[in-house]
């Protein structure tokens, strides 16, 4: 196993709602951010316990919406250990200006939240032409874009991957594929169809590890297939802590167990090297 581990999907929630007021997307705070919040300091302690050296902290969209202030302050406080993945309204005319604002504050990725948690239906704006200036700005700034979405939005991802080939697109939870049918995983055909787009990356989170054990699926048949289609250099681990239940050491252990079927070289990409590709600042 790699001696260094990088997490590209933890979240943080401040205990100071006055300094960092709630502004959740859709107007409804997620249950996890209310019942098991983790502050910056608690994340640092959890990472130390788990042996996770660095992280790309993802904006808690269902708590703070597009106000990335707490995230920016966290990255500023630990600039050698963290980068941040911010959120803006990409359909708004001033989106590129907001993106520049957060980039200057040390945030090197952007998140688009279109499905999940408090949003039960897949949004239809992912490939809206009004978002093109924001995507062009991401290309200019070298920002990776991670997408919280369902597999229903894969056709939209294809259109954006083709239109903006220089933007690294990361699919949270591997776009939530259905794996219970088992090999050859025909129900996940739309996911595998994305392999031909070299700018599309997959984030391996607790959700996909659980899905890989559902029905006829097994980690030993699914993850080698994923590597054979995409290559390990386009796969990266994200804990989804604390949104996913369990301690950070437990979530990392689940990931390691699930990926034990892969060669060491592949796991080195998934736990370290791909993260450095997506967020080069974490390689410093």
Residue ranges: model-predicted function:
Residues 3-6, 19, 23-54, 202, ...:
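Mid-to-C-terminal alpha-helical segments outside catalytic/metal-binding sites
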């Amino acid at each position: 196993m790699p001696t260094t581990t990088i997490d590209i999907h933890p979240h943080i929630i401040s205990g100071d709602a006055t300094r960092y007021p709630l502004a959740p997307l859709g107007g409804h705070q997620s249950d996890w951010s209310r019942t098991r919040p983790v502050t910056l300091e608690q994340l640092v302690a959890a990472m130390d316990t788990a042996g996770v050296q660095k992280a790309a902290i993802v904006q808690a969209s269902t708590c703070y919406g597009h106000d990335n202030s707490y995230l920016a302050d966290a990255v500023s406080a630990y600039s050698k250990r963290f980068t941040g993945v911010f959120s803006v309204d990409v359909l708004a005319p001033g989106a590129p200006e907001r993106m520049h604002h957060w980039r200057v504050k040390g945030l090197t990725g952007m998140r688009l939240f279109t499905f999940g948690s408090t949003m039960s239906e897949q949004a239809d704006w992912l490939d809206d032409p009004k978002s093109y200036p924001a995507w062009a700005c991401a290309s200019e700034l070298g920002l990776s874009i991670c997408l919280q979405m369902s597999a229903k939005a894969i056709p939209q991802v294809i259109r954006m991957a083709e239109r903006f080939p220089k933007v690294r697109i990361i699919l949270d939870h591997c776009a939530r594929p259905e794996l219970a049918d088992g090999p050859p995983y025909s129900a996940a055909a739309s996911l595998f169809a994305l392999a031909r787009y070299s700018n599309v990356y997959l984030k391996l989170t607790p959700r996909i590890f659980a899905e890989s054990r559902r029905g006829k699926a097994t980690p030993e048949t699914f993850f080698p297939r994923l590597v054979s289609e995409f290559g390990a250099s386009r796969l990266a681990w994200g804990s989804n802590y604390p949104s996913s239940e369990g301690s950070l050491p437990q979530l990392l252990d689940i990931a390691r167990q699930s990926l034990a079927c892969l060669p060491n070289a592949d796991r080195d990409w998934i736990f370290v090297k791909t993260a450095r590709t997506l967020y080069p600042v974490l390689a410093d």
